[in-house]
Amino acid sequence: MYMSIFDLVHNIPIVTDYPTTELPAQSEPKETFAFIEQELLESLPALQKKESNNGNGLKQGQWTQGACAALLVRLYMNASWWIDEDKTVEAEKYCEKIIDGEYGFYDIDNRWDAPFDWDNDKSNELLFGYPSSFGGMHWLYDYEMFWQVAPFLSSKYFGFTDWGNCNPKYALQPGLDLNGNEYSFENGKPVRKFMKYPDDVRLKKYKNLGNSKREGMFLYGDLPYETANGTEYVTSDNGAYKLYIRDQVGIFRDTD
């Protein structure tokens, strides 16, 4: 929590006593950094190691030594931005400890999406996972992360309409201008960056394969789905035209 607020606001108060009658003053960034570092370093040896070589298992959602070490890595990697000090050596030190198994067995999964899957408690790539249960807080993650990042009627393409239509709010930053030329700025343009590696399996069009399996990570082009009348396509919210997703923003109806 402190690290997230520190990243967002930078000058934050440090509160170690509760209750208190005085409004705490803001702390200098270096003081906040040192406080977070001390908390993590003191907690690390007191936490449990990961015991399984088949994911976090029953420890899913519990802070372990590996997860704590990962927070230290994040802290040190951001030190140059947060306190204008280079902590790369410290970050590498704890990365090596995680890789070498000092805090339990961790490894890169053989599937890129395994750490994000519904059964990620079996993934050795996962350092920490926030637990959830259906009917609990899962709706917040589903709604903000998925239901707001897809076209209005794309639930038909997904093959899952139990929760109604999508409510699009976010989209990837386009990489091409109206004339089809790539923008000259370096940041963003995620699709253009992925296209530099055509063998990357994540570049495939997202498709629900059934049995809790899927492929790809992007939506682009036409979005077909099957009905009793044959193949149909996702349209605009009012059904006026067939939707065709491209790496541009503009009105392209009736164009190539």
Predicted features, each with a name:
Residues Y106-D256:
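Elongated scaffold/linker segments in the mid-to-C-terminal portions of large proteins
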Residues M1-G159, D247-D256:
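Structured, solvent-exposed acidic/aromatic patches
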